[in-house]
Amino acid sequence: MEASTTTVKARSTHYICGHAGDSFVKIIYYKDKVKAVVSYLNMNDYLNTYALKCVIPEKITKDFFSSCPDDLLYSTLASIQRGYSPKKKEELGGKWEPLLLLYHRGEEYIIRAVVPQRRCEDCGKQFVSSHQCNVRRREFYHHAVLPDTKTWWKPIKFSPIGALSNAKRLFIIYDIETYTFHSGYGKQLVPYLLVMQFKGDSRLRCEAEKIALECGFQPYRQCFMMLNKARDVIGHKFKDMRVQLQKRAASDIWSRYREKHDILSEEGVSYAQLEAMAKDNLLKTDAEPEFTEIIVVGHNITGFDEIVLASHVLEGLPKDEELQMFKITRNFMPRAGKLLFNDVIMALPNAAFQKPKQSTFQRWKTGDLRPEDLKWEGVRFMVRDTVLLTHSSLRNAAQAYQLEVSKGHCPYDALNQYFMVGTYLCDENMYPAREYWSSDEEYLENKPPDGEKYDLVQKAVDYCVNDVKVTVALVKKLCSGYQQFCDEVLKLDCTFNVFQRPTISSTTHAMFKQMFYKSEPSAVGKFLPNLEAPSEVMYEHIRKSVRGGRCYPSFLGVFTEPHLCYDICGMYASALSHPMPYGPTLSPFDSAVAIAEFQRKLDGQSELSYFDPDIFPMIVVADAFPPSLHCLDVLPPLCSKRSGKLCWTNEPLLGEVLTTVDLIMLKNRGWRVKLIQNAECYAVWREWRPLCREYVSINIAAKEKADREKNQTQRSISKLLSNALYGSFATRLDNKQVVFMDDMSSTTQSELRSGKASIVSMTSVCSRSLPQKDTSFWERYFNLPQVEDSISAELNDEPETEPFIGGERSHVIYKPITFLSAECDNLLLATVQSNSDWVKNDRYATQVASFVLAWSRAFMSEWATILYGEDIGVPYEQRKLKSVYGDTDSLFLTGEGHRLMITKGRHKLKSSGNSLVYRDDGNLAWLVECETSCPSCKSDSFSSESCFLAPKLYALKDTTCPSCGLVSGGKLRAKGHAKSCITYDVLKSCFLDHYLLERPTEQYQSERTPIKRTLANGSANSAPFTVVEKQLARVIRPWNDPTMARGTDLSQGFLLFPYDQKRPNPRPQEPLLENPFWDDSSQTA
């Protein structure tokens, strides 16, 4: 039997695809151009006619054919460059067949044919007649190729949560005390005392203490202090100390860097030269990198102290030859009345840097960060605020974290009056009068023994020192507590520094990303797998689905029946444990199929399950139409902002951006839902997965364990981390950034030059402590009053004509000028705004925040079914009153509502022992408990009488325990008002005056003295980076512009009903931005 043979034939042609003009083409060309040219000549009978020997040159151009007779010149010469666009076409006449040349990858080829093609809109594949789409190709084309949609989603960068174990850290914990100075901008707060203490690396601490002494700070009780009421002295000295400390730390790093890398040049070496040396491998890769971190810490310093001192501490380091070897970058962010970031990095090239590899990614899953992971080494200077990490006052933080030191008390008003006018009201021992203290207990507790003099200033110094010591203890407790949490709860093998990030929100977000990266088997890169951030057009679409919470009363007035307050336990934490969108979004084709299938289910008669595996997670545009009026309830499922105000309404919802959870909730509540399948923007995912459940479960378990062990520190940490996670996903971004002109990056500069960005405002940060030269001295030689000449006055002769132009002397007023010795760019802050209409986002998975709020609305919907399910078909006016006030996560229930909760809703009470975390059992996981509990026996207590004036403005008269009969104090909520001047009787009198009288006889108001912070953008009434006191008076009155319709009147109040088709919203709806009949009108015109 003969062996089989295989004949291999080489292909004579190849092809490439592209588009020429507006059409797609497939270009087939000959691989062997010599044979192709010979065939071309034979086809035109050139060789047989003239019997010439054909010599094919390397480059085939029209010059090759110049030896041909004139009457046989080829007709057409054309070429297509790179297969995308026609390059040239020459009509030369003649009798030969057209010749097409292709220039491809630097070579010339003879084209056999150009075949027109079609392109699939779903996957981008080009074909002649037909083809079969591939799911993965469709998704890749939608996410990475198609220009209209490839910018909709961005990968989220990941970095391990750990801190460098070899970094040397120095903490500067400080506090200031201020008094009121009457400036041109009002009552400006000026520091008169600064106290600080150094903690951390012993070598850095000794150097810092030496610099503090050199700058004029005095040691006192293991701290350093400066007492001076002059406006700029303390700020100037504190700035000098910080700058000198940065310079010495940088000099120390640089001296060792030179030794390790044998840099012998005595002249200045620039950072660019060091980078070039690193690229040429002239730096030693085995030298251990060094890192120094200087952390300025205080309590509420980003919202007060750093702003008061801003004109000094915001001045950057001088970029002179002394520091030219460092790359100095600054991260500066004033936001929401706080200086969130003011970090400075002084970087040197890290020769030990290694590109991440497979083993690196596996190490990152444990949170371990090492020096070889960073491209730089050097000094990092940070400003951190313990308020942003504890969300409480210093006194409450001391209790929450079980600190042994106490904060003390200080009569601020007496000190303020003393520094303003030099005296204050006091007794014979100089002890401040009672009006300066907040209570009688505080007044008596701090009063010295008879005959002992009270030193007000010394007490202020001691009080400030105590504050600093409490903050020092808090810093230690936070460092050790979070390290323990990272080791024992998160099970990570890394060093953790809680002050590496500025807020609790950024800390918990980093922890979530770390745990998510650790749990994903496909996590082998610098980005989070299967979790993306919406950007540009998609970011705006997703943000429209992030709706605010519910907050309004169902009753306005004085309610005299017993009622209780029920609260959902950890609502956002429970919502985070439910399934979320997972993976990339589907292509338009697959999305259309999924939306159509979901619409079919929505059109069905049966209720839908939130956890139906055949329903994909999606955020789409939809219209929703309510059922008949008697089938509605007083807790609407959704809110709308079409009228300009957020209204929870039972009116039709048109063009709203909704999640899958919202759509199922509306369907189950009897609403008719229509998905807009031809909407411009949509997001459909293929899979549900509880992304945050593991992290939330860990925090809840840690909190319960800390409760059992009475570990208040771990309880506070786990509770804060759990509650702050939702807020990190819901962070709203914008197109603005505030930068110093001297620190503007090359990227920002190029965007400004190209017109992609523009400077919308400029702010100067000038300090009187800068070196300056004043010309007011010359004023004494100008603007002198003109005195009549005494000799002329004695003579009768008329004075001679004055020998200068003009009839008035000193008609120009001399104005002195002050010259500052500083670079302009060091004093200018620019607000740079992108000219793009869309916001770029590569940090936050905003769709998670949208679904968290949707799950929380599903909780409230299920709660509404428990309370109002039996009222379906009954008019509003005939229903029993079951709730009088509602907030995002709470309801004030009447006796009837309480009865329903302990009967029909017993399984949703926390005492039932059910889980707060979703367990894949097809049921929503949420529990409630009674917030008004008895302080003695912990039983559910009720309020006998309450007054509701407006959202977040109400008062409970008392709380009465039905078990033990204890009557305790009530509850007051008055957002935006000074609670000190509001009582239950005041709110009750206010409502009755407005309710019973046509014109109230008395005007009710609250007064307080808030602090107004001005950051980068100043005005005529406020200077940049100043803190001033403002007297604010607010009128107390019933809900002035309610977003609900008035219902049934009661004896001391009335009910409020949601808007519906019978009681429509009186506000105008969203106006049309264009004529909807534009096309028709243009045709008839």
UniProtKB/Swiss-Prot annotation:
Region Disordered: start-end pairs: 1059-1085
Enzyme class of the recorded protein, top EC level: transferase
GO BP annotation list: DNA-templated DNA replication; viral DNA genome replication
Molecular-function GO term, any one: nucleotide binding
SMART domains assigned to the protein according to its UniProt record, in alphabetical order: POLBc
Subunit structure, as described in the record: Heterodimer with the terminal protein; this heterodimer binds to bp 9 to 18 of the genome. Forms a complex with viral pTP, DBP and hosts NFIA and POU2F1/OCT1 for initiation of replication.
Summary of the function given for this chain in its UniProt record: Eukaryotic-type DNA polymerase involved in viral genomic replication. DNA synthesis is protein primed, and acts in a strand displacement replication.
Family in the record: Belongs to the DNA polymerase type-B family.
HAMAP family referenced in this protein's UniProt entry, alphabetically: ADV_DPOL (MF_04055)
Protein's name according to its UniProt entry: DNA polymerase
Taxonomic lineage of the native organism: Viruses, Varidnaviria, Bamfordvirae, Preplasmiviricota, Tectiliviricetes
